[in-house]
Amino acid sequence: MGVQVETISSGDGRTFPKRGQTCVVHYTGMLEDGKKFDSSRDRNKPFKFTLGKQEVIRGWEEGVAQMSVGQRAKLIISPDYAYGATGHPGIIPPHATLVFDVELLKLE
C-alpha cells in the first residue's frame, strides 16, 4: 500500500516541500486501533526534518512531499513504509499499519 494521504484541511495548494528543505510539522501518531504512541502537539513543540535525508520513515518522506504548506492530512502508512517486521519495541508492534495526523506548518 505504501502511504495514503487523506486531506483533513487544505493548505495553500502551491507550496510543496522539495528535497533538502526542512519541513516543520505537528503530528500525532497512532496505531490502527487509534492508540496514540507519539505527539508533537502534546509536547507543544513542532517536529522538524529534512526531506530526502532519510531522517523519518519512508511513509513520511513520500506523504509529506505531497502536502502543501498549511495542509493537515491523515497519513495511513503500511508496515513496509513504516517500521516493518521489527516494529519499535515497546511502542510499535511488528507489521503495524500506522496512522498519522500531520500538519505542515512551514518550510525552512
Swiss-Prot record:
Chain ranges of the PPIase FKBP-type domain:
20-108
- What does the activity regulation annotation say? Inhibited by both FK506 and rapamycin.
The source's superkingdom equals Eukaryota
Reaction(s) catalysed by this chain, per the record, are: [protein]-peptidylproline (omega=180) = [protein]-peptidylproline (omega=0)
Hydrolase keyword on record: no
Task: Tell me the compartments it is located in.
Answer: Cytoplasm, Cytosol; Sarcoplasmic reticulum membrane
Residues found modified as N6-acetyllysine: 53
- Molecular function via GO: activin receptor binding; calcium channel regulator activity; enzyme binding; FK506 binding; Hsp70 protein binding; I-SMAD binding; identical protein binding; peptidyl-prolyl cis-trans isomerase activity
> Which EC class is this protein assigned?
isomerase
Tissue note = Ubiquitous.
One GO CC annotation, please? sarcoplasmic reticulum membrane
Please name the GO terms of the biological process aspect recorded for this protein, alphabetically: amyloid fibril formation; cytokine-mediated signaling pathway; heart morphogenesis; heart trabecula formation; muscle contraction; negative regulation of activin receptor signaling pathway; negative regulation of transforming growth factor beta receptor signaling pathway; regulation of amyloid precursor protein catabolic process
Q: Which UniProt keywords apply?
A: Acetylation, Cytoplasm, Isomerase, Membrane, Phosphoprotein, Rotamase, Sarcoplasmic reticulum
Q: Which residues carry this modification: N6-succinyllysine?
A: 53
Membrane topology note: Peripheral membrane protein
Give the EC number(s) under which this enzyme is classified: 5.2.1.8
The text of the family note is: Belongs to the FKBP-type PPIase family. FKBP1 subfamily.
Know the name of this protein? Peptidyl-prolyl cis-trans isomerase FKBP1A
Q: Which organism is it from?
A: Rattus norvegicus
